UniProtKB/Swiss-Prot annotation:
Function: FAD-dependent monooxygenase; part of the gene cluster that mediates the biosynthesis of the dimeric xanthones cryptosporioptides. The pathway begins with the synthesis of atrochrysone thioester by the polyketide synthase dmx-nrPKS. The atrochrysone carboxyl ACP thioesterase dmxR1 then breaks the thioester bond and releases the atrochrysone carboxylic acid from dmx-nrPKS. Atrochrysone carboxylic acid is decarboxylated by the decarboxylase dmxR15, and oxidized by the anthrone oxygenase dmxR16 to yield emodin. Emodin is then reduced to emodin hydroquinone by the oxidoreductase dmxR7.
This protein's name: FAD-dependent monooxygenase dmxR9
Enzyme class: oxidoreductase
Residue numbers binding FAD: V96, R162, D365, A378
Pathway named in the protein's UniProt entry: Secondary metabolite biosynthesis
Family: Belongs to the paxM FAD-dependent monooxygenase family.
Gene3D superfamilies membership: FAD/NAD(P)-binding domain (3.50.50.60)
Cofactor: FAD
Protein keywords: FAD, Flavoprotein, Monooxygenase, Oxidoreductase
Organism of origin: Cryptosporiopsis sp. (strain 8999)
Electron transport among keywords: no
Encoding gene per record: dmxR9
């Protein structure tokens, strides 16, 4: 990592997380896809009985790595982890991961300790763009006392440093004895139902097969062609985001920045302006900001290439008058070559995430994209991984794996759909702010982290609902999910419908039935 930038789109050392670097001397990697429990210096979870299900993971992002870990713990054979990049890519900066996604870490002592040591328990505050204070400092709603008492897993701070969280997953994968195969780009997926296999064709012409192929390779995964026949088209939100992270000491060289934040150790502030907002994060060693304006130029692309000049961001910022001078000063402290410009694009959610025979299954962004400002993309990808591994365990054998993937799909689709709709609620909250309502009751400005999301345990839910889902798919028995807002009558929706409501001046939050709090 370059000293002046954090989380840039450059492949790291592909050998850093080779198993031999993380295992005690004299231990070796097994070749049958079961990893190893021969390490002396790690604390591994108890592994469930082997199922004999061979799983090939395509994509070594957070969803793919959690799939690897949980599939190993649930007794499945990991026959490969394929990644298109030439090494681990530490793109990204500060992320929100909600408790539902990491309750499973109670089974992974090393990762639980790592997360608790490395996360940032920043206070959260809300400001008007002029500098007028709105609300805070406070905690995210998922850390209110009423929710902490019964929580399984680690304490979850408001902010995770993406690179640190991702390295935690890479370390744990290496400790199991698995090696990510880099430079392996999937160009097409297939399945042979008669043979009971799914497969992937790589750019090199190599073919790999398994009982279950997990497409965790992100946006525009070629698994879409097998499953849906086409890539899901995008629709612009009319917004984009500029994001960056760099050492705190660089920001503190500016006098105006020092005056505002020098005495602040750990804070996450949201500054709300007309049609735009900026999130500002400070830890003891990192500063990060994400500025979300109207995308007036349409020049942003879905790429983590840090190719934006800070002065261009300042120009966008100052399209709205009366910003507190500290914000423009902070933006100018970003080093050149450290700012990513990303469009906020929506994709309608498809109901089907598996191939017809169930041997190829999608998770994370390949199944359901979330815009980077949603605070939910990583959470739902990790929930996917936990759910899929548990469903395969309950399937119990390779011959039952295709039905297990379809049960996973059934358990996840409606919940993810509702989570995506919450992204619109939070977007309107920050860009179409009801100031009369906020000044009358400032707590209403808080980012929405609903109980039905953060109090969920995807592993327990899969255990509880698998049998009912099985009966529904096999025999047509009634089935109802319970992992979305209580009292909500689920109806599939489209981005076009939501935008029609927004353009009619309606608040998405006001149109929601049931308890979305």
């Amino acid at each position: 990592m370059a000293p002046s930038t954090i989380g840039t789109n450059v492949a790291g050392d592909k050998y850093e997380y080779d198993p031999e670097n993380w295992m005690a001397k004299g231990t070796s990697t097994l070749n049958n896809g079961n990893g190893t429990k021969g390490t002396l210096d790690v604390d591994l979870p108890e592994r469930h009985p082997e199922t004999g299900i061979n799983v090939l993971v395509v994509g070594a992002g957070m969803g793919g790595l959690m799939t690897t870990l949980e599939c190993w713990r649930k007794g499945h054979n990991i026959v490969g982890i394929l990644e298109r990049n030439d090494g681990p890519v530490y793109s990204g900066d500060i992320i929100v991961i909600q408790p539902s996604a990491v309750s499973v870490l109670r089974h992974w002592p090393d990762m639980m300790r790592d997360m608790e040591d490395e996360q940032v328990n920043a206070a959260v505050s809300y400001e008007q763009h002029t500098g007028r204070h709105i609300y805070g400092p406070t905690v995210p709603s998922f850390n209110e006392l009423e929710h902490l008492a019964s929580r399984k897993g680690p304490f979850v701070a408001p902010a995770q440093i993406r690179e640190k969280f991702y390295r935690m997953l890479l370390r744990q994968v290496a400790k199991l004895g698995f090696k990510v195969q880099y430079g392996k780009r999937a160009v097409s997926y297939f399945e042979d139902i008669a043979a009971g296999k799914g497969g992937v064709v790589l750019e090199s012409g190599e073919i790999q097969v398994a009982d279950v192929v997990v497409a965790a390779d992100g946006l525009r995964s070629t698994s879409e062609i097998l499953i849906a026949g086409e890539h899901t088209p995008t629709k612009s939100s009319g917004m984009s985001i500029y994001r960056t992270a760099y050492p705190r000491e660089m920001a503190m060289k500016d006098e105006t920045v020092r005056k505002r934040w020098a005495d602040t150790k750990e804070i996450w502030e949201y500054w709300l302006g007309p049609g735009m907002y900026i999130g500002v994060f400070f830890s003891e060693d990192v500063v990060s900001w994400g500025f979300t304006p109207r995308d007036t130029h349409g020049g942003a692309t879905e790429s983590w290439e840090p190719d934006t000049d800070p002065e261009d961001v300042v120009k966008e910022l100052l399209r709205v008058p009366d910003w507190d001078p500290a914000i423009a000063a902070l933006v100018r402290t970003a080093p050149k070559g450290a700012i990513v410009h990303w469009p906020l694009l929506w994709r309608n959610l498809r109901r089907e995430w598996t191939s017809s025979g169930g041997h190829v299954v999608q998770l994370g962004d390949s199944a359901h994209s979330f815009v980077p400002t949603s605070g939910n993309g990583a959470t739902q990808a990790l929930e996917d991984a936990i759910t899929l591994a548990t469903c395969l365990q309950l399937g119990g054998a390779a011959r039952n794996a295709p039905l297990a993937t379809k049960i996973y799909n059934l358990l996840r689709y409606e919940r993810v759909s509702c989570a995506q709709k919450m992204s619109f609620v939070n977007s309107q909250l920050k860009t179409e702010t009801d100031w009369d309502g906020i000044w009358a009751d400032p707590i209403k400005v808080r980012t929405r982290f609903p109980k039905w999301i953060h109090n969920h345990d995807p592993e327990d839910y899969a255990y509880a609902k698998y049998g009912q889902a099985f009966a529904h798919l096999v025999a047509g028995a009634d089935f109802a999910n319970e992992n979305f807002p209580p009292g909500h009558h689920f109806v599939p929706w489209s981005i076009e419908e939501v935008y029609a409501d927004i353009e009619a001046g309606k608040k998405v939050e006001a149109l929601l039935d049931g308890d979305w709090s």
